[in-house]
UniProtKB/Swiss-Prot annotation:
This is Leucine--tRNA ligase. It is found in: Cytoplasm. InterPro entries: aa-tRNA-synth_I_CS, aa-tRNA-synth_Ia, Leu-tRNA-ligase, Leu_tRNA-synth_edit, M/V/L/I-tRNA-synth_anticd-bd, Methionyl/Leucyl_tRNA_Synth, Rossmann-like_a/b/a_fold, tRNAsynth_Ia_anticodon-bd. A motif ('HIGH' region) lies at residues 41-52. It is an enzyme of class 6 (ligase). The keyword Transferase does not apply. GO terms for biological process: leucyl-tRNA aminoacylation. The lineage of its organism: Bacteria, Bacillati, Bacillota, Bacilli, Lactobacillales. GO terms for molecular function: aminoacyl-tRNA deacylase activity; ATP binding; leucine-tRNA ligase activity. Belongs to the class-I aminoacyl-tRNA synthetase family. Keywords: Aminoacyl-tRNA synthetase, ATP-binding, Cytoplasm, Ligase, Nucleotide-binding, Protein biosynthesis.
Amino acid sequence: MSTYNHREIEPKWQKYWAEHHTFKTGTDKDKPNFYALDMFPYPSGAGLHVGHPEGYTATDILSRYKRAQGYNVLHPMGWDAFGLPAEQYAMDTGNDPADFTAENIANFKRQINALGFSYDWDREVNTTDPNYYKWTQWIFTKLYEKGLAYEAEVPVNWVEELGTAIANEEVLPDGTSERGGYPVVRKPMRQWMLKITAYAERLLNDLEELDWPESIKDMQRNWIGKSTGANVTFKIKDTDKDFTVFTTRPDTLFGATYAVLAPEHALVDVITSAEQAQAVADYKHAASLKSDLARTDLAKEKTGVWTGAYAINPVNGKEIPIWIADYVLASYGTGAIMAVPAHDERDWEFAKQFDLEIIPVLEGGNVADAAYTEDGPHINSGFLDGLDKAAAIEKMVAWLEKEGVGNEKVTYRLRDWLFSRQRYWGEPIPIIHWEDGTSTAVPESELPLVLPVTKDIRPSGTGESPLANLTDWLEVTREDGVKGRRETNTMPQWAGSSWYYLRYIDPHNNEKLADEDLLKAWLPVDIYIGGAEHAVLHLLYARFWHKFLYDLGVVPTKEPFQKLFNQGMILGTSYRDHRGALVATDKVEKRDGSFFNIETGEELEQAPAKMSKSLKNVVNPDDVVEQYGADTLRVYEMFMGPLDASIAWSEEGLEGSRKFLDRVYRLLNTKELVTENSGALDKVYHETVKSVTEQLEELKFNTAIAQLMIFVNAANKEEKLYVEYAKGFIQLLAPFAPHLAEELWQAVAQTDESISYVAWPTYDESKLVEAEVEIVVQIKGKVRAKLVVAKDLSREELQEIALADEKIKSEIADKEVVKVISVPNKLVNIVVK
């Protein structure tokens, strides 16, 4: 039989693994531990697409490899199952989001199992399970006790259509919501915040210890955004009021010609003159409709309004006008800036637009034409004149501190984490607000605070979550008769995913989040694979919670994930017209090797793009598994290119991977397997073991598969195959194509045991060199023969072999041999006359 039947083999082995608990996490204390973690998915209604298995296959290959190397392997899977889509679906259909979520999880699990991943399902977690979110709530109560969870009246990104506020990170650059693309408006609301800023310095510094892609570390550094500079206090003319600005360039204070406050700044209404009151009020309203991202877009037109008030520049006593402008955010820094238009592009554009004074304080450039943003000696700066940047900053900070009008200051771009959502489908926040004005956390003995089941999950309309409608759940009375009201906000989806990797370590513990000894044994996670889109949010939040738990003594390590790897994106086949617009695949036909728009007849260019329903180019893994088999999908996704590259899906590539597996099947089913080693495959076999082992360590799965192909080609040229090499090859194949490998192992090793824990093959360094070499035989300097001989023969042995060769014998039959020159491993030159 020339091909194998994947429809028979794959379900057979999946059933075997499940029945035998083959992938139960090892607990042998004499073995090293290896923790391979996937970013767990949100179980959407659409199910898996072929992008999901790329990362999952990578961790699965490593897990199977490490088991064979004698490690205890923790390789778990779970569900990040709270979130807006389930709630939106429930509102649209009237169904319970819990039912919808359970159906989706069952479908995801079916699809994942069909791909042959070696998960330990005894450790499955689900963020919506009360036994799980009991500990999410417990972490929150600890944050609350330590003052790191607090309530504040803050301007939030309110999305009317979603009935909830969303975090800054969930607002797109165009000012719409990441989920749904709805308009986002700013409005002040009582919100729960987590004080992630208390950990800013540690979150920044500890990045140095991590084996993460530098690009991800840079994104976190930029998000944390550490700046060293000075706070400067400006008094407001004719009042007893003042405001503080933070600047990284206090040395340019002599060039500050106006100040700008955020429209939401507390002083705006106090200092605005009667003449400017209406203009200021109108501007404040307009600013409230924009997201932070839209307001700070560098490309947008500069807008602003003068308040009618003046500030006093502390260094020279000059009166400078105070404006409001939406590019200054109340939530960033002090909500006020000093503007030095000569040396800042945004300030320069603003000054030009509103005809404000521009005074150069650094030499170089022509500030009439553009802001000069390079460095140079100070000018127009009194006691700083002639100094360079570093010396001038130091001198100005000393002056500010001496005069009592400023001080050195470190600030961070990082804001505290907006932690509440006005939705139903999330973890209830375990806080009770009492009528006497106090608030307390729900005691640990009463956790979990279970989300009540209700059919009425529409937003309350008051800005509170639907939980505000459930009075039986909402209202509580203390033993002393004081009445209270439960917190109605729920936690964001990020909560459950900030610590799930800890629960996998001890998922059934009812007494604590996880056992200390087990945490010590498994942390930090050895390899975490997932999409780069989680660079800032999830990874930063998880690091914050981990550090907090480290401070509590709950976890033994400072960081959760030692090595992080981002797989690339699998792109779909798509087509562009002459305008660059994408055309859905069902509107395209292929003629004579070219592609055409069925409706317009226009020839189209093939161009990979992100898979999407609208382009009708989403590939469902169910279809691939049915037609080609799970092993083919696994091998193809690992062979299509480097794991971190984004590559277009190709049906031809898929067929190529299947053909390779069929060749493997034929080789091991038709070739005579022998117990005596002829030595013919020594070099290629040992090279293959060495190469595949090294490439697995480096996550270079495509080159590992290429080496397996080299071995198959070499083995096919031989009449017989040494059985030990056949077995070793099957072991090397097993992490990539586990079903086929199990089937072949049974036949070749003549066993009914799984291959999963068979010791990984080793290679012999001495076999990596050629046993034979090709030498040339020359007569009078001309090549007359090429001979394959044993390596490292002596000069005498080479001479003997050359002179005994039939062809050479006939060439020199009637000639006298004058001299024979032999060079070992290279040539024999025969001089005749």
